[in-house]
């Protein structure tokens, strides 16, 4: 048998397994800029302080003409 024939009788070798191609790393998601802080509202005006309630007006007693003391 020639050398070539003998080689042919060898069981076929499975084709070499190709290593799976290494995928490139997926791109990281784009970095979003920091969201704007909410606009700072001006301080709300403090509630207007109500004016002090006037004390109820006491009706002045009816005028009594003051009689001058009678001189004796």
Curated annotation (Swiss-Prot):
Transcription is among the record's keywords: no
Subcellular location field: Cytoplasm
UniProt repeat feature Sequence, residue ranges: 21-29, 30-38, 39-47
Induction info: During squamous differentiation of epidermal keratinocytes.
Family label: Belongs to the cornifin (SPRR) family.
Top-level division of the source organism's lineage: Eukaryota
InterPro entries named in the record: SPRR2
GO biological process entries: epidermis development; keratinization; peptide cross-linking
Composition bias type Pro residues, residue spans: 56-72
Keywords carried by this UniProt record: Cytoplasm, Keratinization, Repeat
Region (Disordered): 1-20, 42-72
UniProt name for this protein: Small proline-rich protein 2E
Keyword Ligase: no
Chief localisation class: cytoplasm
Reported function: Cross-linked envelope protein of keratinocytes. It is a keratinocyte protein that first appears in the cell cytosol, but ultimately becomes cross-linked to membrane proteins by transglutaminase. All that results in the formation of an insoluble envelope beneath the plasma membrane.
Disulfide bonds: none
